[in-house]
Amino acid sequence: MDPVVVLVLCLSCCLLLSLWKQSSRKGKLPPGPTPLPFIGNILQLDKDINKSLSNLSKAYGPVFTLYFGMKPTVVLHGYDAVKETLIDLGEEFSARGRFPIAEKVSGGHGIIFTSGNRWKEMRRFALTTLRNLGMGKSDLESRVQEEACYLVEELRKTNALPCDPTFVLGCASCNVICSIIFQNRFDYTDQTLIGFLEKLNENFRILSSPWIQAYNSFPALLHYLPGSHNTIFKNFAFIKSYILEKIKEHQESFDVNNPRDFIDYFLIKMEQEKHNQPLEFTFENLKTIATDLFGAGTETTSTTLRYGLLLLLKHPEVTVKVQEEIDRVIGRHQSPHMQDRSRMPYTNAVLHEIQRYIDLVPNSLPHAVTCDVKFRNYVIPKGTTILISLSSVLSDEKEFPRPEIFDPAHFLDDSGNFKKSDYFMAFSAGKRICVGEGLARMELFLFLTTILQKFTLKPLVDPKDIDTTPLASGFGHVPPTYQLCFIPV
């Protein structure tokens, strides 16, 4: 038979199979735009996927279905739908959804991209160990305060000249997480540290590009083609190779009775669990969970700080109020402490508003349902990917009047006291809430207050001309590059 005829027949069969699969499953799922064969709804989405999700929610409601390729994804938009799934039905929606590029990197190990018993074991261990290492206690606070001092000294070296804060802020947050995982910090000129930060920053930019959205929709097709996904694989291989070296060093020197850091605690657990089945405390899980913590603990915090400084340059009246509160509560010579935060409602509100406004990760990492779930009037089959729009919660007009405006009053009551909000989901919510939330909150408060205690921020242009629009909006919101001067006070 003519090869062309065979090809046409095969494609026709695939087309019919695709249409059948979509129509057969679609009856159980929420409504949504009609998908095209093979490619689904990908052509109907803007490169700013969050804008597309917002528009689709107006047409189909807060719960709707999209197809990325031939796989359905249920989208949750708005506070009520998000709360109902993440909190009220947390267990049923707790699995990790498809994220092919991350699955390729993690290999089914670690904490971020696993599900089921492995995820529960890794998460439980990580939370316990981070507490043992001082998360939420004065021990870890002292480490962050010490790093804040190094950060100040590095900023002084700029001599009040224009500088891009990206690298120095990355060094500070990276050193904190390194002290937890490896029990060591780097000098800000260390080439290994520079390499880490360059690769993490590059990965965040690439993950927020349209190419990765396409890769995650068609991994089998695009995996073997040239493209920026290969850069992500190469960068993570570099980081994992360093972590592997550190693990080997720890294997030769750790003391079971005196664990020094996260790796030591994991090695001890490996020895304790080596006869248990299924075996979860393995070398591969250690390597990947350390990479998970390293990546998540560095890039998100440093990018939030970088975006935060840009917003403070844009809004000098806010900066002045924060510095007045610092002078009143802490003074100029005493180091900020976490206990100061309760007496600094305006600063606390500013930190929350920075995170709300920048909306760093607009959609949570994909979830999946652990079983067939009856949700509202729909039935979502086991394993279906769930996309949760955190952006829709952080920009809800009912909770945050004029959400497009940067305004710390969103988190202040009429008396000027800090006002908590259930809508603040910058760290997600429920069973998959960020493991390092406590550490991130500590770093953001101590680093930002220390910087504003010691320096005046001077923009290079008129504040009204500062553009805070993200460079890219995909996996994350990538802040624009900028320079400023740190003027010692």
UniProtKB/Swiss-Prot annotation:
Q: What is the lineage of its organism?
A: Eukaryota, Metazoa, Chordata, Craniata, Vertebrata
Q: Which cofactor does it need?
A: heme
Family per record: Belongs to the cytochrome P450 family.
A GO cellular component annotated for this chain's UniProt record is:
intracellular membrane-bounded organelle
Among Pfam families, the record links this protein to:
p450 (PF00067)
Which GO terms fall under molecular function for this chain's record? heme binding; iron ion binding; oxidoreductase activity, acting on paired donors, with incorporation or reduction of molecular oxygen, reduced flavin or flavoprotein as one donor, and incorporation of one atom of oxygen
Q: Which PROSITE patterns match?
A: CYTOCHROME_P450
Predominant location: endoplasmic reticulum
Native species: Canis lupus familiaris (Dog)
Upregulation details from the record are: P450 can be induced to high levels in liver and other tissues by various foreign compounds, including drugs, pesticides, and carcinogens.
Which UniProt keywords are given for this protein, alphabetically ordered? Endoplasmic reticulum, Heme, Iron, Membrane, Metal-binding, Microsome, Monooxygenase, Oxidoreductase
According to UniProt, the name of this protein is Cytochrome P450 2C41
Asked whether the keyword Membrane is assigned, the reply is yes
Binding of heme occurs at: 434
How this chain sits in the membrane, per its record, is: Peripheral membrane protein
